[in-house]
């Protein structure tokens, strides 16, 4: 079986377009970079991980002397004839010709999610962002290489995994960016931009020379067709950066400021579910129900979606991950699953919650779990949850961010109505009356929306 690295050098995967940057994306990155270049000092431009040379073509059309670097000899065969001689076969992370002289450095470097991490000590020793580390994500090293290649005042345009802009554990990378450049823009791309992956990506535009001062253009595009200079100006928002937060949703989605609301963290205690992986991930034919993200539905806990059991004597049994009647299970991770909420309404629904979810325990009578479940999965609130989400292929919301969600405190009568409605909804679902259960959900959803808007 071939390793991912070996697959990378297989022409078949290249030809299928696995690593192809769509022309609309490459053309936009080159256009945006040129617009923000103060002057052509050297007239040099490069792509340190050039692949088939799509960026080189657009740079060359604009009159630049171009250099492309790629470790894969195959790219010479698949590159267009007009840039074939401009590609040098060498490791883009090694010392490159004209390093520190390029007016423009653009590209779409490989991501560690596909190729793993760099462990070579000689390579790691050359980069500030890998100092003191046994390994580093390849895209982080390439990001620093883009900075090394650009001259002071040169413009960088690079496609990166979204996590670099949002993950709390990658703040040191954002600090490096802000310390060494004037960030011009961060533009989030649609999930289907690249063939074969739904991982989130964004384009970083920066002018070398820091520290950063001033405002940044933030934008999210829903289609590659919106990647034009005029469209980005319409869609984007010029913002003052907050701390090291560089992901557009934080700035583009307005934070809810709700009257008579309390942060979720003041209403509940939050603990994480737990589980085992590898050889210890063993289920039993009977025992304690296992609550995976699949069973957490808008209509309550539904074990028909994924019926598994945990033996009390196995390593899969986690005492702190046991959810009791009256507690709320909140799915914290996953595209399409994040923000799912369900109340444990009976002893039969109690169980061990896996690590995709949080368990919320009320510490006040200002709300009840039934209202909270309806409230947190309301579309308006789910948008706020997504605003605070982090990650690339698998997004998640940290506890400290979830605790910031404002919760409107309703009248006691509405709390009682939510309790009745939730239990009735679960009952109807168990009886197979899905449409009737759904109508209850929609009715409460509308009432909560009215409460939020008013």
Describe every region a protein language model picked out.
Residues 198, 204, 350-358, 389-416:
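A short glycine-rich beta-alpha junction/loop motif
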Residues 200-212:
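Conserved beta strand-loop-helix elements of the APE1-like EEP
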Residues 134-192, 203:
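Conserved Class I SAM-dependent methyltransferase catalytic core
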Residues 319-321, 325-377:
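A short beta-sheet element
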Residues 13-107, 112, 160-163, 179:
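Conserved S-adenosyl-L-methionine
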Residues 229-279, 409-454:
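Non-catalytic DNA-recognition/assembly elements of restriction-modification systems
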Residues 265-279, 294-325:
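Sequence-specific dsDNA recognition surfaces
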Residues 110-138:
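Mobile active-site "lid"/loop adjacent to the S-adenosyl-L-methionine
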């Amino acid at each position: 079986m071939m390793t991912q690295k070996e697959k990378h050098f297989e022409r078949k995967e290249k030809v299928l377009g696995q690593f192809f940057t769509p022309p609309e994306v490459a053309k936009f990155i080159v256009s945006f970079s040129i617009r923000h270049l103060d002057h052509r000092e050297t007239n040099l431009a490069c792509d340190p991980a050039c692949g088939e040379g799509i960026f080189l073509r657009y740079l060359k059309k604009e009159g630049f002397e171009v250099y492309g670097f790629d470790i894969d000899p195959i790219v010479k065969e698949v590159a267009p004839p007009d840039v074939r001689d401009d590609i040098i076969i060498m490791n883009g992370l090694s010392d490159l010709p004209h390093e520190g002289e390029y007016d423009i450095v653009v590209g779409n470097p490989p991501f560690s999610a596909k190729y793993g991490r760099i462990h070579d000590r000689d390579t790691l020793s050359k980069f500030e962002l890998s100092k003191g580390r046994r390994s580093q994500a390849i895209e982080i090293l390439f990001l620093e290489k883009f900075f090394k290649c650009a001259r002071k005042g040169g413009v960088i345009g690079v496609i990166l995994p979204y996590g670099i802009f949002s993950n709390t554990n990658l703040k040191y990378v954002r600090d490096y960016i802000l310390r060494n450049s004037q960030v011009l823009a961060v533009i989030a791309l649609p999930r289907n931009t690249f063939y074969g992956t739904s991982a989130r990506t964004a384009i970083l535009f920066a002018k070398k020379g820091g520290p950063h001062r001033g405002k940044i253009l933030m934008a999210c595009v829903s289609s590659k067709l919106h990647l034009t200079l005029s469209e980005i100006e319409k869609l984007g928002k010029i913002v003052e950066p907050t701390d090291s937060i560089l992901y557009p949703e934080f700035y583009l989605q307005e934070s809810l400021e709700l009257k008579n609301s309390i942060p979720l963290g003041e209403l509940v205690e939050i603990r994480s579910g737990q589980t085992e992986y590898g050889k210890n991930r063993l289920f039993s034919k009977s025992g304690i129900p296992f609550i995976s993200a699949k069973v957490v539905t808008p209509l309550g806990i539904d074990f028909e979606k994924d019926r598994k059991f945990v033996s009390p004597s196995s390593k899969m049994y986690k005492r702190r991950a046991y959810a009791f009647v009256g507690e709320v299970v909140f799915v914290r991770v996953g595209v399409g699953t994040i923000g799912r909420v369900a109340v444990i309404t009976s002893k039969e629904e109690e169980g061990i919650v896996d690590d995709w979810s949080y368990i919320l325990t009320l510490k006040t009578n200002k709300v009840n779990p039934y209202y909270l479940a309806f409230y947190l999965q309301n579309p308006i609130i789910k948008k706020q949850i997504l605003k605070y989400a982090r990650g690339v292929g698998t997004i998640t919301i940290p506890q400290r961010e979830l605790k910031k969600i404002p919760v409107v405190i309703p009248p006691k009568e509405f709390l009682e109505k939510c309790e009745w409605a939730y239990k009735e909804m679960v009952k109807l679902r168990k009886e197979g009356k899905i449409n009737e259960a759904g109508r209850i959900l929609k009715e409460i959803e509308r009432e909560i929306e009215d409460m939020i808007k008013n």
